[in-house]
């Protein structure tokens, strides 16, 4: 009788331990590889103080480590090739790749690497990190919204995030044509990652 009771207690503890392990696994940090076809880096600048001109960086890459239960363990890395700048005007894009602006020959990447992630509210996070452009690295802090998550038709689990923020291009040494092109650059980044 005593042996049977010990056996039942042992089984109960074992099942409880399994539940704890599996529940912790369910909320462990997950790594997502950015899907370049569904990730956008869009920017806008004001031309002559009159109207906005929009552009984008095609084919951004990177990864997101997301820990829903411990957001401080999350991390983001993202890169875009400066040669992939695209404003839908070939002549302007060629100029943007020149030493006057992105200097794509010498500085092929613009990149961001997070240093901290903090949850602000449901689906909203504060991400601080380093933005590198033209060989200069500057700290930035942005508010990021989790926009959705779920399986795609092929069985991959995807997660989306979006942020909008502004920088001054002069902070990175890009000061050509300051009167004709605004110093302030507004950016929107929409990222979709595939769980690995």
Residue ranges and their predicted role:
Residues 2-14:
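Bacterial N-terminal signal peptides that target proteins for export
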Residues 27-196:
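Low-complexity, acidic/polar, glycine-enriched regions of mature
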Residues 11-23:
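Bacterial N-terminal signal peptides
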């Amino acid at each position: 009788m005593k042996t049977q009771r010990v056996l039942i207690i042992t089984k109960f503890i074992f099942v409880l331990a399994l539940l704890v392990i599996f529940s912790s696994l369910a909320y462990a940090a997950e790594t997502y590889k950015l899907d370049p076809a569904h990730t956008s880096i869009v920017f806008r600048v004001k031309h002559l103080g009159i109207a906005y001109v929009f552009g984008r960086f095609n084919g951004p890459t990177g990864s997101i480590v997301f820990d829903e239960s411990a957001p401080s363990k999350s991390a983001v890395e993202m890169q875009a090739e400066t040669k992939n700048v695209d404003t839908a005007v070939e002549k302007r894009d060629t100029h943007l790749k020149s030493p006057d602006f992105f200097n794509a020959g010498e500085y092929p990447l613009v990149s961001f690497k997070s240093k901290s992630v903090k949850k602000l509210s449901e689906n909203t996070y504060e991400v601080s990190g380093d933005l590198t452009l033209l060989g200069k690295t500057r700290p930035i802090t942005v508010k990021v919204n989790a926009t959705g998550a779920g399986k795609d038709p092929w069985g991959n689990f995807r997660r989306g995030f979006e942020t909008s923020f502004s920088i001054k291009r002069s902070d990175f040494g890009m000061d050509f044509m300051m009167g004709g092109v605004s110093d302030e650059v507004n950016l929107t980044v929409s990222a979709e990652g595939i769980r690995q």
